[in-house]
Amino acid sequence: MNYCPRPKYLYKKKIINKLIEKFNYKSVMQVPKLKKIVINQGINVLIYDNKTINNAINNITAITGQKAIYCLSKRDESGFKLRKGTPISIKVTLRRDIMYEFLDRLINIALPRVRDFVGVNKNSFDGEGNYNLGISEQIIFPEINTDSLKNNFGMNITFVTSSKKNKEAKYLLYLFGLPFKTKKNV
């Protein structure tokens, strides 16, 4: 038997049927799916050095299980004391099984470790069916060693779906188990 991540198995066995039932799709191909998860972490340029960049890349790589890359600034910005070609952020794009494994760890391990957690914001959709989740501290992931962590950066996690409507994407992420805020738990 082949290995299948838990959210992927859940999607194939239960979520597709629930989405077809709720939105009356005529074909299985119309059912929205999670295409990719993009994790982006901005780096403070004022404390920039190669060691900071390498530590941040190693941390994101440990969290996601996939090598992260850094993004360079495209032009000089004197207001930010930024030179062209300076690394300003780190990103990693997750697809297929690695994406589902990260989603499982995020929902079941990392988000419950957030202090005073009541759910994620349900209004962070972009109008095209994509959801953005901001995390202020990376130490919620158990892969991060807090003793050796010098700079604690936050990150932005973008869930890209094949849906063009926020309502469908929200229901898809809800069925995956993403805990949205409700009036009861606020």
From Swiss-Prot:
Keywords: Ribonucleoprotein, Ribosomal protein, RNA-binding, rRNA-binding, tRNA-binding
A Pfam match: Ribosomal_L5
Listed GO MF terms: rRNA binding; structural constituent of ribosome; tRNA binding
Annotated Gene Ontology cellular component terms: ribonucleoprotein complex; ribosome
A biological-process GO annotation: translation
Family annotation (InterPro entries): Ribosomal_uL5 (IPR002132), Ribosomal_uL5_bac-type (IPR020930), Ribosomal_uL5_C (IPR031309), Ribosomal_uL5_dom_sf (IPR022803), Ribosomal_uL5_N (IPR031310)
Subunit and partners: Part of the 50S ribosomal subunit; part of the 5S rRNA/L5/L18/L25 subcomplex. Contacts the 5S rRNA and the P site tRNA. Forms a bridge to the 30S subunit in the 70S ribosome.
Main function: This is one of the proteins that bind and probably mediate the attachment of the 5S RNA into the large ribosomal subunit, where it forms part of the central protuberance. In the 70S ribosome it contacts protein S13 of the 30S subunit (bridge B1b), connecting the 2 subunits; this bridge is implicated in subunit movement. Contacts the P site tRNA; the 5S rRNA and some of its associated proteins might help stabilize positioning of ribosome-bound tRNAs.
Family: Belongs to the universal ribosomal protein uL5 family.
PANTHER family: 60S RIBOSOMAL PROTEIN L11-RELATED (PTHR11994)
HAMAP family given in the database record: Ribosomal_uL5_B (MF_01333_B)
Name of the molecule in the record: Large ribosomal subunit protein uL5
Organism: Karelsulcia muelleri (strain GWSS) (Sulcia muelleri)
Gene name tied to this protein: rplE
